[in-house]
Amino acid sequence: MSASTAAPARDRLRIAIQKSGRLAEPARSLLAACGLSWRQSRDKLFCYGESLPVDLLLVRDDDIPGLIADGVCDLGIVGQNELEEQAAERRRHGLPAAYHAVRGVGFGQCRLMLAVPEEWDWHGVAQLAGKRIATSYPAILADWLERQGIEATVVELSGSVEIAPRLGTADLICDLVSSGATLAANQLKPVELVMESEAVLAGAVREPADARAGLLAMLLRRMDGVLKLRDSKLLMFRAEQTKVDALRRLLPDADPLVQLPDDGNGALRLQTMCHGAVTWQRLEELERAGAQGLMVLTVERSLA
C-alpha cells in the first residue's frame, strides 16, 4: 500500500456522486480522467481511493447536498436543480446552505420548466393564479412564484409528476425537461422557464484546512484541465509567413498560434489548441487559405 492511500481517515478527501441515474457514469468518468481510481466495497456504496486518498460515496442525488452540509463529504457532483432546491428549503427554515457550486462540470444540462396540457391556450404567467402546480421542486417553484407575484398552490410529488394533470391532482406541472419527449408522451407542452440546470461540483462553503486542502487544490486543477480539453483538439500545420494572418482569422476559438522550429522546407511550422469543433469543412477551409500538412490530435491531459 502506498503512503498516500495509508493516510488517516481525516486526511482523506470524500466525494459523493449519484449511485445510479443519468449523472452517475459521467461523474465517474470525469473523476477517472482526473487520475482517480478506487476499490469498491462489498455493499457497493463506498469506493476506497487507491491512486490518491480520495474516496467515493455512491448515494441518491438528493442526499448529496445534505452530506456536504453535514461535513460527511467534502465534495459532490449533483444537479444544480437539486442543490438549489435544498438551499431554498434551508433558507425557508432560516438555515444557511453551508455549500455552494464550485464549478460546472459540462454535462447533465436540462431546464426546469412549467408545462401545461397541450389544449391550453397559453398567454403568460398570469394564468397561473389560483392553479395547482405539481412538482418535485417545491421550494424552487415557491420562490419563483413569489418573484412573479403569483399565488398558486404547489403540489409536491416525489415522482411521476407528468401524469398529475391526467389524474386530476394538478392543473399543470413544473418539471425537468431535457428532450421534451416525456412531456409530449403525456400530452403536455413546455411554456415557461423556471431555471437552467446542469451538473455541478459542489463543495462546503468552509473549505478544509488540513491535509485535504492540498488534495482539493490538486483535484480542482486536474479537473479544470480535463474540462478545458473536453472539446479541444491540437491542430498542427505548415504555412508561408504571408498566409499566417488569414489563417489566424479562421481560428477565432483557438489559442494564439505557436511557431515550432523550422523544418527546413521554407514554411513555418505552427500549432494551436482549438476549443471548438474541428470539422472536415473547417480543415478544407484552412487548406484553401494556405495551411499545409494539417493534423488534428487529441490531447488527454494538460496543466495550465
From Swiss-Prot:
Gene Ontology MF, one: ATP phosphoribosyltransferase activity
Organism this protein belongs to: Xanthomonas axonopodis pv. citri (strain 306)
Function comment: Catalyzes the condensation of ATP and 5-phosphoribose 1-diphosphate to form N'-(5'-phosphoribosyl)-ATP (PR-ATP). Has a crucial role in the pathway because the rate of histidine biosynthesis seems to be controlled primarily by regulation of HisG enzymatic activity.
Name of the protein described by the UniProt record: ATP phosphoribosyltransferase
CDD domains hit by this protein: PBP2_HisGL2 (cd13592)
InterPro entries with a match to the protein in the record: ATP-PRT_HisG_long, ATP_PRibTrfase_cat, ATP_PRibTrfase_CS, ATP_PRibTrfase_HisG, HisG_C, N-reg_PII/ATP_PRibTrfase_C
Gene Ontology biological process terms in this record: L-histidine biosynthetic process
Alphabetical keyword list: Amino-acid biosynthesis, ATP-binding, Cytoplasm, Glycosyltransferase, Histidine biosynthesis, Magnesium, Metal-binding, Nucleotide-binding, Transferase
UniProt gene name: hisG
Catalytic activity: 1-(5-phospho-beta-D-ribosyl)-ATP + diphosphate = 5-phospho-alpha-D-ribose 1-diphosphate + ATP
GO CC, alphabetical: cytoplasm
Enzyme Commission no: 2.4.2.17
Domain of life the protein comes from: Bacteria
Pfam family, one: HisG
